């Protein structure tokens, strides 16, 4: 997760205020990996509801160039995101946009995650505790994008809706 790597670097360089509580570093990593697995769902909804397909459509040449680029590894491990990226862009090209089945699956991916946050926010003001963390920042982006796509965040998840409104001020 590049953004997590950047935050980790900034956290080491500028330790105050802390965005990754030391006592929860492993938990943060696991939760951000979960958030990262939903990235393609967020992209599908963004491309379906915000961005006209013609603007983001990739040509065969662009797809071939992307496929050939890079080492195929991240931190010495196979880059499993690349195959997902290629499949996403090929589907976009084949269907001239995000297919209905992909959109439906993406919509269904988020309620359980927000339900987990609903439980956490019943016990504390932020996702990890009493202060803002990198997890709040990551999920703010998702909540903002999904709200813009018409997801009824405050209706389905009132605590998450209140948390979002507080961060959105």
Where in the sequence are the language-model features?
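Surface-exposed helix-capping loop/turn segments at secondary-structure junctions
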Residues: 119-130, 169
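GST superfamily/GST-like fold recognition
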Residues: 127-147
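Long, positively charged, glycine-interspersed low-complexity recognition regions
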Residues: 143-169
